[in-house]
Amino acid sequence: MIAKNIDVKLNVRPIYIGLVHEYAYEGPCRFGEGDALEKEYDQMVSRETYEIFKQDVFSHVPAGINMMDPIYLEATDEWVNSEKIYETLSAEIDKIDLFVFNFQIARGFIYVEFAQRFHKPVAMIPHSCCEETLNTAALHARGHEAYAFYSWADYEGYLRALRTRKALQNTRVLVASRFSSVKSYGGTDNFVNLEEITNRLGVKFRNISVHELLDQLHEVDPYSNPTIPGRKGQNINAEDTALAEKLADEFIANADEVRMDRAAIIDTFKAYVLVQKLMDHYECNAFTAPCPDLCSTRRLSEERVTFCLTHSLNIENGIPSACDLDFNSLLTQAVLENLSGKSVYMGNANVCSLEDGKLPTIFGDFDDAHIDHLDDKTNLYSMFHATPTRKFDGFEQPLKKYSVDSFAYSGFGATVRYDFMQDEGQEITVCRIDPTGTKMLAAKGTIVASAGYDGKSCGPLD
């Protein structure tokens, strides 16, 4: 079973710290009269505030967040920093990703020492009188991870972001490579240093030879693969072939149009099923394979497969997947899918500026006819790849309309062909992580045109 990073949960522990005065008195930090100065009154108010706190935090739980049992604590005006406090706070600490606190004046010393002791991310809920900014500043100055929020909507956004960070930390990429497991021959803007990506983001990379992978496409004795003679491979078997046939028939049945042979589609699904087996075997939940250097082996041509459909199906099932060893795209997918709950489209990007009023030839059949309906032909930008998915509306939503055609003109390599005009006017996010892995471009766009639905190779295009 592949442990998908979209299923990762962020474990959050809510903590409320009340303040109980042991004696009745007034002073510069305490004021009131009558029963309001009694210890029992403080305890009553603290409990009431705790109930409000619980209602607030459990009313703002985004998808993928696991709110753990809350903790109630009482500090006193003895200012004794009791060890029992930290024993209580640290219960199940290895399971917890974020501690969310609520308290008011004169309890921040507990918050700060907790972060110093245990080095876990902490946060304060919005609207905690006076305490959010000063305690966050105190911890930032000491080099600790701490958050404060402008509003509950802001709070929920940070929870989603922190869950996405955890999803990245739980991403393990199966890298099929020929010459190099770090260098892409079709994408020089790839990550410069994968070790740095692992150190900073926690993403792990597991390697397999493309030849070892392709050998296992054959339904033969798994000990007979020429690349690993005598060692058991994960070769597809009769059960896997039956599954590939079943998946292919479902793929055909759900399509508006199919323009290639069923047998060739089944071959493509065998590659998909094999990649699932290998990800499961190596305990990975993401996949990438090279393009130009794999293509030039002629093995894809001999095996009559491409990995385009494997990438499409992986992505629409919440498994980051990229051609051309495009690690940047892979991790961008992980970020976007975890934040949005929708599948994404991986594509090559191009500026479409008109020259002498006409669209320059960029790729395939994308020409002026595809943008004639536009009144405004400025600021156009195109993306294309043979890896659209059928789940752009969400992982749990019905399939979008699509057709099926081969990548190769000789009829092999099934691909999803998608008409983006069915999403005309849809606002989208265009996103890319830079080669250093330290910056991300995120921009808004609107779908206004489409091409390549009836074509082959690396389309469709939007």
Label every model-predicted segment:
Residues 1-32, 145-164:
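Short N-terminal or domain-adjacent regulatory/targeting segments
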Residues 25-28, 137, 161, 220-223, ...:
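Surface-exposed beta-strand edges and their flanking turn/coil or helix-capping segments
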Residues 32-36, 62-66, 86-92, 111-115, ...:
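Generic detector of short, locally flexible boundary/turn motifs and exposed helical patches
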Residues 131-342:
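Conserved, well-structured core segments that form the ligand-binding/active-site neighborhood
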